[in-house]
């Protein structure tokens, strides 16, 4: 069945993989340290991960995680399409789980490290109490990784989860 899934997804995955390789050729930093022990970035090979990372969070739906990462790191995934979020319940559960992690550094990524991973990082920062508002989180993140952004559905899920933080 896995082979059949790959064959069916081929028309989507090949162009996406090529676009991803083009993006890599633009020489932007793969990741940025946002707060101590918490990195945000794009999809990387195991050799590109920052030192100190033990937990890798993958929020891509279009790529399978690299085997070297899946086999050598704690690896959690929440498959999410670009410019979207997962279900509110699964998103909240994962952000709470990440916020409680204290064993090692955490690397959160999507394909380019701009939207889906940023949405999850905002939630983690809110869960940890490191920021009080979505805008404060975005300012903190943009201070390190300027290319981040939230699409409307991503911001909406954050607002619905953290409405008690909104002024």
Predicted regions and their residues:
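Conserved G/P- and acidic residue-centered "switch" motifs that form tight phosphate/ATP-binding loops
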Residues: 113
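Hydrophobic positions on the alpha1 helix immediately C-terminal to the Walker A/P-loop
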Residues: 119-120
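Cysteine-based protein phosphatase catalytic domain of the PTP/DSP
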Residues: 18-107, 123-162, 166
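Short cysteine clusters
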Residues: 110
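Conserved SAM/SAH-binding loop-helix junction
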Residues: 116
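N-terminal membrane-anchoring alpha-helices
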Residues: 1-25
